[in-house]
């Protein structure tokens, strides 16, 4: 059974609201969020962004593929179709039907290459979903 794609109106190439959110999150947690959202921004020319549920979301056009969010002690790098992504490094957490996230804490060393691969896989996945209807 094919699922309907989630779509967000108002995604822009560079949303000032996302930049404002980044400025509102200084310090180590904010730096972690900025670093990984920047990787999402650079996935392709069609990447758009917006704030949704209070956090930055990266989209292919209007179809979301990733987000970052800052919490008290950690940052989540999340994926809207994370349950479908290959994760040989077992970074993904969550038990929902679709979404998964990677929890990053200051002072720990994440598997940078594995997380980068997850972000690019999420972008490729949403691109295929959009192109194949």
Predicted feature residues:
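Charge-dense, helix-prone N-terminal extensions
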Residues: 1-133
């Amino acid at each position: 059974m094919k699922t309907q794609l989630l779509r967000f109106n108002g995604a822009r190439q560079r949303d000032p609201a996302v930049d404002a959110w980044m400025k509102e999150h200084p310090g180590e947690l904010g730096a972690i969020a900025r670093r990984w959202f920047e990787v999402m921004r650079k996935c392709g020319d069609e990447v758009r962004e917006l704030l949704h549920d209070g956090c930055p979301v990266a989209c292919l056009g209007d179809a979301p593929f990733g987000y970052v969010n800052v919490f008290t002690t950690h940052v989540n790098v999340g994926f809207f179709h994370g349950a479908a992504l290959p994760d040989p490094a077992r970074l993904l957490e969550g038990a929902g039907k679709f979404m998964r996230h990677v929890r990053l804490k200051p002072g720990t060393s994440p598997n940078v290459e594995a997380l980068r691969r997850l972000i690019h896989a999420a972008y490729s996945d949403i691109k295929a979903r959009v192109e194949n209807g």
